A protein has these predicted regions:
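Surface-exposed loop and turn segments in beta-propeller and other repeat-based domains
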Residues: 27-49, 88-110, 153-178
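Short loop/turn segments immediately following the C-termini of beta-strands
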Residues: 9-10, 19, 71-72, 81, ...
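Short loop/turn segments immediately following beta-strands, especially the blade-tip
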Residues: 18-27, 79-89, 144-154
Length: 200
């Protein structure tokens, strides 16, 4: 649909640009804003419409869903971004990492995570979440089934990468372990390989 989604974390919002060849121009305005009621508002919030320090984004072209790493609220928001339904200050369809849209406390069970980078595999409908906060146990990548019939709010990870198990905490550098993993929209290549940058 020739749209560009931009995470504007400092202003607690996502900007949506129409990048059709005949419309793109230097200094162009965004067409839609998510997370705020207007283009001049910037307050963080906790609801189905608001977010706090959004970071990485992942796009599902088949289902026309946008996954937003809402790092300040320890969750991932899922928006329906079909052109006929997307609008400014849209309500998220679903949430991952929290039981509802009004909860933001860090969770220590399998359904919680510390949000970081996101990558989406469109062939398998898997969402990869890089957890890269200061808590050692969250220096890992968790893998979720986000297919259309999956229960996202109650989702538990299918697997963990970068650690030998869900209860492994040591920041050891080895073939199976990593520190400060980073993911982005280009992290899955045409051969279905997941490319992970690590640091620290």
């Amino acid at each position: 649909n020739q749209r560009l989604f931009v995470g504007d974390g400092s202003n607690n919002r996502i900007l949506v640009f129409d990048i059709a060849p005949d419309r793109i121009a230097t200094g162009m305005d965004a067409a839609i804003v998510l997370g705020q009621e207007s283009f001049t508002a910037r307050e963080p919030g906790l609801s189905a419409r608001r977010m706090s320090r959004p970071g990485s984004l992942a796009y599902d072209a088949t289902g026309q869903r946008l996954f937003v790493s809402d790092s300040g609220n320890n969750r991932v928001l899922v928006f329906d971004v079909a052109p006929q339904r997307l609008e400014t200050f849209a309500i998220a369809d679903d949430v991952m990492g929290q039981p509802d849209f009004e909860t933001a406390a860090p969770r220590t069970d399998l359904r919680g995570f510390a949000t970081g980078g996101l990558a989406y595999d469109d062939r398998t409908a898997r969402l990869f979440i890089a957890e890269q906060v200061s808590r050692i146990e969250h220096m890992r990548i968790t893998v979720y089934d986000v297919s259309a019939d999956a229960s996202l709010r109650a989702a538990e990870p299918l697997a963990v990468l970068g650690k030998p198990g869900f209860g492994a905490y040591d920041p050891i550098v080895s073939r199976e372990q990593s520190v400060w993993p980073r993911l982005g929209s280009a992290s899955i290549d045409s051969e279905r390989q997941l490319l992970v940058a690590t640091e620290g």
